[in-house]
Amino acid sequence: DVFKPGDHGSTFGGSCLAIAACAATLSALVRGDYAEHAAKVGAYMEQALAKLPHVEEVRGRGLMLGCDLDDAAGDAHDVVARALGAGAVINATGAHTLRFLPPLVCEEVDVDGLIEILSDVLA
């Protein structure tokens, strides 16, 4: 009778499954060359974003990118909503700024899909 119901355990405490998932993730990060991959795919994405209509500037590093839209594009939050409706999850950090943070395993084909959606949304 040391513990009463609710005294021991939690939904937020560490678990063996969470530790195993974390260890596997860290192991994959150590083995992989994600920095080089992010630089390569990020450069591809930066060039593709710069060619879109209404994009004034693209900046960032690797796969962490942002772009500024001209006034004709409308509010960036509306662009985000339309992109989400078409299947792309992006973020607006201001009235004219979009932010992109794709996963490190993102490939050029994934960038192509995003660019296709944004091309339609910004047309």
Each language-model region and where it sits:
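Conserved N-terminal phosphate-binding loop of PLP-dependent enzymes in the Aspartate aminotransferase
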Residues: D1-A123
